[in-house]
């Protein structure tokens, strides 16, 4: 709907009237009227509309308007250039902003990919512990935090972190100082593994554990005593050295262990020369009766010179199948210790263990308590000589020490048909006292 506020005369309206224009009133009055274009007629038909005028609100791209007065120090103002056809102002502004950001980012330095620095230190990988009063260095490797040691200054801890970072992550690692400061270290760390390099860094620090002691390898135990322990490479966390009443005693115990394991180049709390002759490993001066260890597979003989303190005896049981055997049984507990025979020693050195007129002795070595030995009935035994143990049978002695018969006589008596076995209770224990 268009509201036409133009006032027209009656004479002019008759000449220019159209079908859409209402006729003048019948009384012929010359007053004006309001025309409402309700039927969508064009105002150009009446000639009352003004021509369309286009005004440029922004100057052309090449036009620059300088607003400066005479004698004024105000710099000329440059109007912004309009956007090109078909392109709005926001993409141009976003592009300009991106260019500005890209120009400022190199000036700010390389962005770190290892997260923020430690809050308690200006160096990366360094943390200050108020309990110990030391600067401790750590590095993350394969999802685990590796302890590099405690240091007296933050600068020393930062250098330890830098060397570990170069070893673990290469030359592109984020470090605290310049890479040129570690040229000598780069030549040395090539021949070391990660574990060995970490161990070297810890040895150069002022202590392994986070204890409340100023000495290396010493910490205050929760029981109130001082604990000494030493770190170990490739495996266990530390080696426990013991608890001590004083802090100095624990520090000296650590020094002795460090010198024993790492030599004279070990890092100690006190002067290593004060431990001369004090850290040598103790030798075992115990000698077992002057006997030589025999590595040959043979049956060792019991030592009958010592008695066993408890009621259990080691039964050196001699079973006999000869009718000449005595019916008397002498039972006495003997020691379970077995002396070791020298290599090449003849078995004739112990004749009292085999001296008997019975040709059918065989040895059965086992521990049988006296009160629990079962009662066995009569049984027969074979006439052959046998050792009821694993191994080859020992050779017979050339002579019977107690009988005086030769070997041939005893062998003939064993093969004679008249010597048939007689039943008698088995598993008798015969004790032969040593000869003077």
From Swiss-Prot:
InterPro entries, per the entry: AP2/ERF_dom, AP2/ERF_dom_sf, DNA-bd_dom_sf
Single GO MF descriptor: DNA binding
Stretches with biased composition (Low complexity): 9-20, 74-85
Annotated stretches, region: Disordered: 1-123, 407-428
Induction: Target of miR172 microRNA mediated cleavage, particularly during floral organ development.
Pfam families the record matches: AP2
Tissue expression pattern: Highly expressed in seedlings and developing panicles. Mostly expressed in newly emerging spikelet meristems and, at low levels, in shoots, roots, panicles, mature spikelets and sheaths.
Record feature DNA-binding region, as residue ranges: 122-178, 214-271
Role played: Probable transcription factor. Involved in spikelet transition. Together with IDS1, controls synergistically inflorescence architecture and floral meristem establishment via the regulation of spatio-temporal expression of B- and E-function floral organ identity genes in the lodicules and of spikelet meristem genes. Prevents lemma and palea elongation as well as grain growth. Regulates the transition from spikelet meristem to floral meristem, spikelet meristem determinancy and the floral organ development.
UniProt xrefs under PANTHER family: AP2-LIKE ETHYLENE-RESPONSIVE TRANSCRIPTION FACTOR, APETALA2-LIKE PROTEIN 3
Protein family: Belongs to the AP2/ERF transcription factor family. AP2 subfamily.
Protein name from the UniProt record: APETALA2-like protein 3
Organism for this UniProt entry: Oryza sativa subsp. japonica (Rice)
């Amino acid at each position: 709907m268009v509201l036409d506020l133009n006032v027209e005369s009656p004479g002019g309206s008759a000449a220019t009237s159209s079908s859409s224009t209402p006729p003048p009133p019948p009384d012929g009055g010359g007053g004006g009227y309001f025309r409402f274009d309700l039927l969508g007629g064009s105002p150009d038909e009446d000639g009352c509309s003004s021509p369309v005028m286009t005004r440029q609100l922004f100057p052309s791209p090449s036009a620059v308007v300088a607003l400066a007065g005479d004698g004024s120090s105000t710099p000329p103002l440059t109007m912004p250039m309009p956007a090109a056809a078909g392109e709005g102002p926001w993409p141009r502004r976003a592009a300009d902003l991106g260019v500005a950001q890209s120009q400022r980012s190199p000036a700010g330095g390389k962005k770190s990919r290892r997260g923020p620095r430690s809050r308690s230190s200006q160096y990366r990988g360094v943390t200050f512990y108020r309990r110990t009063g030391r600067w401790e260095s750590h590095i993350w490797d394969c999802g685990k935090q590796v302890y590099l040691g405690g240091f007296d200054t933050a600068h020393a801890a930062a250098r330890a972190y830098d060397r570990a970072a170069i070893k673990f992550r290469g030359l592109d690692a984020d470090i605290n100082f310049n890479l040129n400061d570690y040229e000598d270290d780069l030549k040395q760390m090539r021949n070391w593994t990660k574990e060995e390099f970490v161990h070297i860094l810890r040895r150069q620090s002022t202590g392994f554990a986070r204890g409340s002691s100023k000495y290396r390898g010493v910490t205050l135990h929760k029981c109130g005593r001082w604990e000494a322990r030493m770190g170990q490479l490739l495996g266990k966390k530390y080696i426990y050295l013991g608890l001590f009443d004083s802090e100095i005693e624990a520090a000296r115990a650590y020094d002795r262990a460090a010198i024993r394991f790492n030599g004279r180049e070990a890092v100690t709390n006190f002067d290593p020369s004060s431990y001369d002759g004090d850290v040598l490993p103790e030798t075992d001066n115990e000698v077992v009766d002057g006997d030589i260890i025999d590595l040959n597979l043979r049956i060792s003989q019991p030592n009958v010179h010592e008695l066993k303190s408890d009621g259990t005896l080691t039964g050196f049981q001699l079973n006999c199948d000869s009718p000449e055997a005595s019916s008397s049984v002498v039972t006495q507990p003997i020691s379970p210790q077995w002396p070791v025979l020298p290599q090449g020693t003849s078995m004739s050195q112990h004749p009292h263990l085999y001296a008997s007129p019975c040709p059918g002795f065989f040895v059965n070595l086992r521990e049988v308590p006296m009160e629990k030995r079962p009662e066995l009935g009569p049984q027969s035994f074979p006439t052959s000589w046998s050792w009821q143990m694993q191994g080859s049978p020992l050779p017979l002695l050339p002579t019977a020490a107690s009988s005086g018969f030769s070997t041939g006589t005893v062998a003939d008596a064993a093969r004679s048909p008249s010597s048939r076995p007689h039943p008698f209770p088995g598993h008798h224990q015969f004790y032969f006292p040593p000869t003077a």
